[in-house]
Amino acid sequence: MQQEADVNVFQQDLADMKGEHKALEQRVSALERVSDRQDQQIMTLNEKLNKIEENTTWIKRTITGAIITAVSTGIIGGAIAIMYSLLQH
């Protein structure tokens, strides 16, 4: 009789462990899905950051070019004005 009770207890424990195991598998599966979604979001954000970086580089080049053009125009215009005033005298 005692052996049957022990067997029943062991069977109940085994059934409980199987249930807990299934629950843990479901939790792990849910965490994997969340992790996959987060990885995808990170990849999307990295792509957007790369595009922003490319646009920023283009803007910096444009501004640098505009500054160089303005300085060159000022120097050339000043030189022409000086030469013109020298020729007038």
Curated annotation (Swiss-Prot):
What keywords does the record list, in alphabetical order? Cell membrane, Membrane, Transmembrane, Transmembrane helix
Q: Which GO terms describe its cellular component?
A: plasma membrane
Instruction: Note the InterPro entries from the entry.
Output: Haemolysin_XhlA
Topology in the lipid bilayer is annotated as: Single-pass membrane protein
The membrane-spanning stretches of this chain are 63-83
Family note: To B.licheniformis xpaF1 and xpaL1.
Task: State the function annotated in the UniProt record.
Answer: Associated with cell lysis upon induction of PbsX.
Quote the protein name from its UniProt record. Protein XhlA
